[in-house]
Swiss-Prot record:
It is an enzyme of class 2 (transferase). Belongs to the AccA family. It comes from Mannheimia succiniciproducens (strain KCTC 0769BP / MBEL55E). Its main location: cytoplasm. The lineage of its organism: Bacteria, Pseudomonadati, Pseudomonadota, Gammaproteobacteria, Pasteurellales. This is Acetyl-coenzyme A carboxylase carboxyl transferase subunit alpha.
Length: 321
């Protein structure tokens, strides 16, 4: 793995974890005594691990994909920003109430080209999770995002967004400060921006909280990300009065990238490294960068009127199959 976080495993990954633990154990033996040659056994186990990983991830069901989208080691927005962009300068505050740490954004360069990048940001440690409010923005977060988008429009900069949220924060304070209005305003204003907008779901795409920075000319999803109006647990609690039916709900909700591509609600699926994005941050970031560059190339040739018409039609088509 290319990051420093200790790997965590989901239950369906445990057989893979056991093999990887054996490999590490053998390596520690050879490190302690160079006279012991275990290279052949290590190579055999590595081959077996690769085969098992490929088999496991070849046919994940919707519930397993949902859990992959929330994987604690999964790369977040700032992980991608540091690998895809240069000269990132974070901008803070909505100029009305506060700076919401659940949304990050600022100016950056993409292969030398100035852009505006915005995304949801979750935390890893308990302290950071609280600081980022578990990736659930309040109204001031969406107003900050809109402020940055309007700035990008003034300076004719493409806008790139990364979506990864369980949803907008549902607290009383957020509602009092106009959560629904902030989301609705973003939907309206994003549909009229006259610069290219590229959106990518990198983890969870939770309802209006995701859509509030997701109205774009190109909408992509990582292979093991999800996009839905409600979480599987929430859907199960409503329909079956039990969150234990979450796996059933996930199957019928059509929240996976492959299903949404079939419904023509997204443009592209970005393939993840074997075992998921959390196993190879750098490789995943490079694949996503190439997708963004390709999308920008496609959008650069379109005039403002075409951009606006296509984006508006996409928004109006949501909800129709």
């Amino acid at each position: 793995m290319s990051q420093q976080n200790q790997t965590e495993y989901l239950d369906f990954e445990l057989p893979i974890a056991e093999l990887e633990a054996k490999i590490e154990s053998l390596r520690s033996v050879t490190d302690q005594d160079s006279k012991i040659d275990l290279d052949d056994e290590i190579k055999r186990l590595q081959k077996k691990t690769a085969e098992l990983t490929k088999k496991t991830f070849a046919d994940l069901d919707a519930w397993q994909v949902s859990r992959m989208a929330r994987h604690p080691n999964r790369p977040y927005t700032l992980d991608y920003i540091s690998r895809i962009f240069t000269e990132f300068e974070e901008l803070a505050g909505d100029r009305a109430f506060a700076d919401d740490k659940a949304i990050v954004g600022g100016l950056a360069r993409l292969d030398g080209r100035p852009v505006m990048v915005i995304g949801h940001q979750k935390g890893r440690s308990v302290k950071e999770k609280v600081l980022r409010n578990f990736g659930m923005p309040a109204p001031e977060g969406y107003r900050k995002a809109l402020r940055l988008m309007q700035m990008a429009e003034r300076f004719r900069l493409p806008i790139i967004t990364f979506i990864d949220t369980p949803g907008a924060y549902p607290g009383v304070g957020a509602e009092e400060r106009g959560q629904s209005e902030a989301i609705a305003r973003n939907l309206r204003e994003m549909s009229t921006l006259t610069v290219p907008v590229i959106c990518t779901v990198i983890g969870e795409g939770g309802s209006g909280g995701a859509l509030a920075i997701g109205v774009g000319d190109k909408v992509n999803m990582l292979q093991y990300s999800t996009y839905s109006v409600i979480s599987p647990e929430g859907c199960a609690s409503i329909l079956w009065k039990s969150a234990e039916k979450a796996s059933t709900a996930a199957e019928v909700m059509g929240l996976t990238a492959s299903r949404l591509k079939e419904l023509e609600l997204i443009d592209n699926i970005v393939t993840e490294p074997l075992g998921g994005a959390h196993r190879q941050y750098d490789e995943m970031a490079q694949a996503l960068k190439q997708r963004i560059l390709s999308d920008l190339e496609d959008l650069d040739i379109l005039d403002k009127e075409t951009l606006l018409d296509r984006r508006y039609q996409r928004l109006m088509n949501y909800g129709y199959v």
